[in-house]
């Protein structure tokens, strides 16, 4: 959603580090193996965006679509994952409104897509300031029975309310803010 798009880096990083040796110290990667999971255990099964230039494209193509201008450090092969129309809420701020056009049509049925794709964890990389949109996606994750990684500085995992909701549902939640 923004010029320095964490989702682009994440998608490229999974490709770039997929064969990393867990026994080595790898620059740019804190842990090759985290809790028994290797980078190559990450599989993309669904993707959501609101930009008309990205919706409908394969994820591998959409990540390099304007206004994203993140440095390309890995060639992401075609993934067979069509970007679906996401929910906007407050995810399109004043700055982004000048750069992208919201995709037409209704929001995809996020819960059903997460269920149909047998998603385990929803990783949320919305633009900073998208508090309402993040909370909406949190609700979708809980309804679909999937874990949630909040990469934004919006208090979700650290809030008793959300923590309790995830515990009650027996789901993991990680966050808040990818840098924390």
Per-segment meaning from a language model:
Residues 8-9, 155-159, 179-180:
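Short gly/pro/ser/thr-enriched loop/turn and capping motifs at secondary-structure boundaries
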Residues 120, 147, 172:
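Residue-level detector of anion-binding/catalytic polar loops
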Residues 2-5, 174-180:
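Conserved anion/nucleotide-ligand pocket segment
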Residues 20-21, 144-147:
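Structural alpha-beta junctions
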Residues 1-139:
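N-terminal glycine-/serine-/threonine-rich beta1-alpha1-beta2 phosphate-ribose binding loop
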Residues 127-143, 151-172:
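Rossmann-fold NAD(P)-binding glycine/threonine-rich loop
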């Amino acid at each position: 959603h923004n010029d320095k798009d964490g989702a682009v880096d994440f998608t490229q990083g999974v490709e770039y580090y997929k064969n990393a040796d867990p026994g080595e110290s790898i620059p740019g990667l804190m842990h090759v193996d985290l809790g028994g999971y290797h980078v190559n255990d990450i599989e993309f099964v669904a993707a959501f965006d609101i930009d008309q230039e990205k919706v409908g494209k394969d994820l591998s193509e959409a990540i390099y679509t304007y206004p994203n201008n993140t440095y390309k450090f890995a060639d992401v092969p075609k993934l067979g994952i069509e970007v679906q129309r996401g929910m906007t809420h407050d995810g399109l701020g004043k700055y982004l409104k000048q750069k992208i056009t919201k995709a037409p049509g209704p929001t995809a049925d996020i819960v059903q897509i997460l269920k149909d794709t047998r998603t385990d964890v929803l990783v949320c990389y919305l633009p900073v300031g998208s508090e309402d949109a993040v909370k909406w996606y949190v609700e979708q994750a809980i309804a679909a029975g999937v874990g949630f990684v909040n990469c934004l500085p919006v208090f979700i995992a650290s809030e008793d309310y959300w923590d309790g909701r995830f515990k009650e549902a027996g789901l993991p939640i990680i966050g808040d803010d990818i840098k924390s």
